């Protein structure tokens, strides 16, 4: 990670090559091949192969969704703890009003800009993307799945 370029709004999205380029690609090929076999050699075995291939693709997609959802839950917990230590007064009492997306986006904000950004997010009902765009001192998340 030392040789990675600094993370910012433009490059913060993570692509997992093993999933996005290998597993997904192989599952798609398996479905196409199974479809070809069903058309060419229709029978119970070919239908079973197609069902297995589709199941493999759905399983891969669900596993990815489960991993990111779990990580979102952990990020929400981390950010609530972080906000408890950074915010004071009325802002601190309004932490529960932040949406899941707002909490997840706030993880990229440096400690110094968090209080103002939280106040703005709550006052303007900022969506996740707008919060990320408003971050000046980007705090990288290099461990995102």
Model-assigned labels for residue ranges:
Residues 106, 127-145:
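A membrane-cytosol interface segment of integral membrane proteins
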Residues 37, 86, 108-111:
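Charged/polar positions within long, soluble alpha-helices
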Residues 105-108, 113-114, 121:
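Juxtamembrane regulatory segments of integral membrane proteins
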Residues 3-69:
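Membrane-targeting alpha-helical segments
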Residues 117-127:
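Short, surface-exposed polybasic-and-hydrophobic patches located at secondary-structure transitions
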Residues 56, 101-104, 116:
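Positions in alpha-helical segments
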Residues 73-104:
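Membrane-cytosol interface motif
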């Amino acid at each position: 990670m030392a040789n990675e370029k600094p993370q910012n709004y433009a490059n913060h999205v993570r692509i997992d090559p093993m999933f996005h380029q290998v597993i997904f690609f192989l599952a798609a090929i398996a479905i196409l091949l199974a479809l070809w076999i069903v058309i060419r050699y229709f029978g119970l075995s070919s239908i079973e192969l197609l069902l297995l291939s589709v199941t493999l693709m759905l399983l891969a997609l669900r596993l990815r969704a489960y991993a990111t959802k779990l990580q979102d839950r952990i990020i929400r917990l981390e950010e609530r703890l972080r906000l408890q230590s950074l915010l004071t007064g009325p802002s601190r009492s309004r932490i529960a009003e932040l949406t899941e997306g707002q909490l997840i986006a706030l993880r990229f904000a440096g400690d110094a800009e968090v209080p103002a950004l939280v106040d703005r997010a709550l006052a303007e009902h900022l969506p996740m993307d707008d919060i990320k765009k408003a971050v000046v001192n980007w705090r990288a998340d290099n461990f995102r799945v």
